[in-house]
């Protein structure tokens, strides 16, 4: 999928508005500007931000109500994928995104973009600093599944859904993690990469 096709998919299939696309374009341009000085994303993906990063993040919208009310927490938010993309899409005033990122440089970028786009988000430096109150947890290129389950058990205060973007080792990680009866899951293919999976 090329960049134009990715944009068209966002509009036609995921129902992003033209205003959303404009905001995503500002996000993309800010990312490219920051990336000249800091390593926010791989330089090899700079020409495929719409398909490789934005659409990859936006596909998670299929897994919760588009008018979702409540809190979404993005663990290891990095350059804002998927958390910022989800925040741009959902304008419900009762929808709130928390971004957790340990890198000071990346937190600086997230703060700058969220202020520029007037997004309803909070930024934190460490997922272990508090008992996290969230309905949905999203992760992309974060930790291995056994570590994610451990964090979920130790830091989350209430029942929650976890949505994880994983690479080609997804099934191997599932086979090697201990899931008790409180957890159930399904796995499906990513629309942006044949080797990637989404675990819900």
Question: What are these language model-derived features?
Answer:
Residues 58-135, 139:
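Conserved SAM/SAH cofactor-binding pocket of Class I
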Residues 169-200:
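Active-site capping/gating segments
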Residues 96, 120-122, 161, 182-186:
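Conserved beta-strand segments of alpha/beta enzyme cores
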Residues 159-171:
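Conserved beta-strand signature within the Rossmann-like core of class I S-adenosyl-L-methionine
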Residues 111-112, 149-152, 175-176:
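Short amphipathic alpha-helical segments
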Residues 1-67, 73, 104-119:
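Class I SAM-dependent transferase core
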Residues 141-144, 168:
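Short glycine-rich anion-binding loops that position phosphate/pyrophosphate groups of nucleotides
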Residues 149-162:
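A short glycine-rich, Lys/Arg-flanked "PGG" loop and its adjoining helix->strand segment in the class I
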